[in-house]
Amino acid sequence: MPIELFNNGDHKCVAFTELVQGEGIQANQFLITDGGEGMLLDPGGNLTYKHLLAEMANYFLPSRTRYVFASHQDPDIVASANGWLLITDAKIVIAQEWVRFIPHFCIKGVTEGRMIAIPPKGMDLELGNSRLKLIPAHFLHTVGNFQVYDPLSKILFSGDVGASVMDGHSAGLPVEDFDGHLVESHMDGFHRRYMCNNKACRLWVNMIRQLDVEWIVPQHGGSFKGKAIINRFLDWFETLECGTDLLSEADFRIP
């Protein structure tokens, strides 16, 4: 069931949290539409493709899909690239580091002229009458990692930053108990393992505090809506020890 995060009549942001069925990790897919044009955000792989295709038709036709944005290269992000390139005229928008990896998901030649490489500093992207910001989140958790900030809705689509593990229905609800969420939804453990290090966390938080964000919506699990819980999340993430901060000789022993 689609969840409308924002709708002013012309500009809409929509989340899908229950499309993954089976053994795959729960994942959220998103779309933004403005002026009749559409963009898919982290549309996933074969587990979500046909379901997302059916749902998106309620908001825009495949022929009006201008972009498929991929925050990074993981299969739960963009393994369905081949399908979208075949049935739409959309271009895939992804970090320049991953442009030559996407063809491995596709039949030969289908990506030619269909890729937009995001430079390391990020960029603006026009969609209909709106302008979206693609902002860097490098090493959170991959090199060449980007997020989408929508100034109109004030939503930050944060990819794996803020991600947690839960069922699809629960993922459609904003987090209310932050401290409980840290443990019960495995957010703390996920970030300690998947995020690169505290330096990357601190630099990212410093950048995000410069934006007017009303809602942080990750690609897995629940979201953070409202200034109070967003600040609580930023305070936690800013001091998090993770990734290489936690490595020791014990992690590099011959089995």
Regions found by a protein language model. Name each.
Residues 48-93:
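Active-site metal-binding motif and surrounding structural segment of the metallo-beta-lactamase
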Residues 41-43, 64-73, 92-96, 156-160, ...:
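Active-site neighborhood of phospho(di)ester-bond hydrolases with catalytic His/Asp-centered motifs
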